[in-house]
Amino acid sequence: MGLNRLMLAKKTTASGGSTADNTFTVTIGQQGYQYGFSRYNATIGEVEGNVQHEGKAVTLVMLCYYSGYLDFAFTIEGVSSGKRNVTVKLTLVDNGTSGTIEFPKIDYQSYVPGFYEYTRNLTSDVIRMFSKANVGKKIKVEIIFN
């Protein structure tokens, strides 16, 4: 099948205008001690843009850090079962701080509904991205479908 990459990022005005097709802009939000973006059991942060994978719309549901855990969830239009192997690369747009997170087996969870997994296996750079100091800042998220 090959390597499929989705860029979830902001295209700046200097490089051609508003948010480009197949990209997201994620703005870090906060609710209590929870930081990131979520539309599952909370409304935190913002995301905009249009992303497709294999011709189907992808929706970011959650990229949220709380108490040592990073929750990650997304949906693929028309898909309601199965599992994926994805790598998520995060880059804080302000200063270029980045980190990579592996989700080798992210299963579809009907209660979300969507592909959902959490991890505690995070670098200190990733942990620092999700902090009070970065609320309102932009984060670039690259999802690599392996």
Give a label for each model feature.
Residues T23-V61:
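Transition segment at domain starts
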Residues V112-D125:
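Aromatic sugar-binding surface patches on proteins
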Residues G136-E142:
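Short, surface-exposed ligand- or partner-binding patches at beta-edge/loop junctions that are enriched
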Residues V126-N134:
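Short, exposed beta-strand-loop hairpins at the edges of beta-sheets
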Residues E48-V86, L90:
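Beta-rich globular "head" domains
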Residues G99-P113:
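Solvent-exposed serine/threonine-rich low-complexity stretches and specific carbohydrate-binding patches
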Residues M1-T19, T25, Q31:
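Enriched but not universal
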